[in-house]
């Protein structure tokens, strides 16, 4: 057996020597560079799973994720055939429509924030200004066409006043998209476009902007700041999405901007690391559900009117039936209306106020985000992790134009008159 085993080994090594002899080795190094849009805003290779903070499309209706500011004859109209919203203005000077999300999206330091907007701008004409991007009234980044000229714009309020730094297409520092740039492409902003930007904030980083054409990211202009400026370039990178169209003066006929889809993505995931707060009914003062089948507010939350761009997320609810063997139903409702009671600040550094003494509640046009049943007992409260898989579903919302903070309410009803409950809610404030 030893001889046979030795023969096998000799045969194996002879074949190995033959294979190795056919290989050509080179000691020269081959430089490999992976950059450009293959990496995120912090230079990390784009291999991580993106976490979607927000997405918007319009399949069956103008969804409830946006609010409008309308001046003159402007309007927002759902277009069922095209699956989008038509934003229109007339020809009169001052006609304007602005569409903004009811939520502000959380930038997490050290994570690249990728934003995409799709749209079709209306025909270029004198005095007509059209915009789309990641911005609000005071800060942000957006693409603009005024008349027939395209711009990338950085809006900042770090000086105490709003300053719009516009960079005309001819001056874009990556690709002017006039046929002479690296891509060889010519931008037609009256055609369907996918605008993208990735944001490396940390107060001082770079914002890369461009378009996605033929399935490829085409960088157009970078707003660079590190080693160049003396302060932050915008007040915050936690911002809403916007579309807008304005007649700066009279125009020749009506105009239409088609709003299609939007998304905000945190590249590399997202971890909640905010301040944790809670509010609830006092142990000695349970909520009495006077009329069976009627929902009453147990705890209501809303943003302070002075902090409508704050980011606060409901994370858990706890509710306990005081009346043994009584049957209850609870709901978490966005944009309902609490009547009566007193709104109390959750703290000097908090952007939230709460109401635990409301006397009546109306769902109205609000949305029921979660619901459940429980029975009164002496076995402890029912705790519900309200986050589940949708991290920002229970984020507090607002209308920046009115301005109004929308409520988020834990409401409860019982099967019998006069049953009582105790309840509390937990939330996390990211912006602080």
Can you name each region flagged by the protein language model?
Residues 1-30:
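Extracellular "spike/adhesin" assembly and maturation modules
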Residues 33-47, 226-293:
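Ligand-recognition surfaces built from glycine- and aromatic
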Residues 61-82:
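Extracellular glycan-recognition surfaces and repeat-rich motifs
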Residues 87-165, 302-305, 321-329, 335-344:
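Secretory/extracellular carbohydrate-interaction modules
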Residues 107-121, 266-414, 422-431:
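Beta-rich globular "head" domains
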Residues 125-148, 216-219, 404-405, 412-432:
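C-terminal interaction-tip segments
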Residues 129-192, 367-380:
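Glycine-aromatic-enriched beta-strand/loop faces of beta-sandwich-type recognition domains
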Residues 190-206, 212:
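Localized edge beta-strand/strand-to-loop motifs within extracellular or lumenal beta-rich domains
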């Amino acid at each position: 057996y030893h001889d046979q085993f030795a023969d096998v080994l000799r045969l194996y090594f002879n074949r190995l020597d033959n294979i190795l002899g056919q290989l050509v080795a080179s000691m020269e190094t081959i430089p490999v560079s992976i950059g450009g849009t293959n990496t995120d805003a912090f230079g990390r290779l784009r291999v991580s799973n993106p976490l979607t903070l927000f997405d918007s499309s319009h399949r069956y209706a103008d969804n409830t994720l946006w609010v409008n500011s309308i001046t003159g004859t402007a309007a927002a109209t759902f277009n069922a055939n095209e699956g989008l919203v038509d934003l229109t203005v007339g020809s009169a000077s001052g006609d304007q429509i602005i569409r903004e999300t009811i939520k502000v999206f959380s930038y997490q330091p050290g994570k690249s924030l990728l934003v995409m907007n799709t749209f079709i701008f209306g025909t270029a004409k004198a005095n007509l200004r059209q915009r789309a991007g990641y911005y609000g009234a005071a800060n942000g980044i957006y693409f603009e066409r005024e008349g027939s000229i395209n711009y990338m714009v950085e809006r900042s309020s770090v000086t105490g006043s709003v300053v719009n730094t516009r960079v005309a297409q001819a001056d874009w520092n990556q690709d002017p998209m006039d046929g002479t740039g690296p891509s060889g492409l010519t931008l037609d902003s009256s055609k369907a476009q996918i605008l993208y930007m990735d944001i490396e904030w940390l107060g001082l980083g770079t914002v890369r902007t461009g378009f996605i054409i033929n399935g490829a990211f085409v960088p157009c202009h970078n707003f660079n700041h590190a080693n160049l400026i003396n302060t932050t370039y915008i007040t915050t990178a936690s911002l809403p999405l916007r579309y807008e169209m304005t007649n700066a003066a009279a125009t020749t006929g009506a105009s239409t901007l088609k709003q299609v889809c939007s998304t905000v993505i945190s590249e590399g995931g997202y971890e909640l690391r905010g301040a944790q707060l809670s509010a609830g009914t006092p142990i000695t003062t349970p909520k009495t559900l006077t009329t069976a089948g009627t929902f009453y507010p147990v705890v209501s939350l809303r943003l302070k009117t002075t902090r409508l761009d704050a980011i606060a997320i409901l994370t858990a609810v706890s509710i306990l039936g005081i009346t043994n063997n009584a049957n209850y139903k609870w709901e978490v409702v966005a944009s309902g209306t609490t009547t009566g009671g007193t709104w109390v600040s959750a703290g000097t550094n908090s952007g939230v106020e709460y109401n635990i003494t409301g006397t009546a509640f109306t769902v109205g046009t609000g949305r029921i985000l979660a619901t459940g049943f429980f029975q009164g007992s002496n076995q402890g409260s029912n705790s519900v992790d309200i986050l589940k898989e949708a991290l920002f579903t229970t984020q507090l919302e607002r209308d920046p134009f009115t301005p109004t903070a929308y409520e988020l309410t834990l409401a409860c009803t019982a099967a019998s008159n006069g049953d009582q409950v105790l309840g509390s809610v937990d939330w996390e404030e990211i912006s602080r």
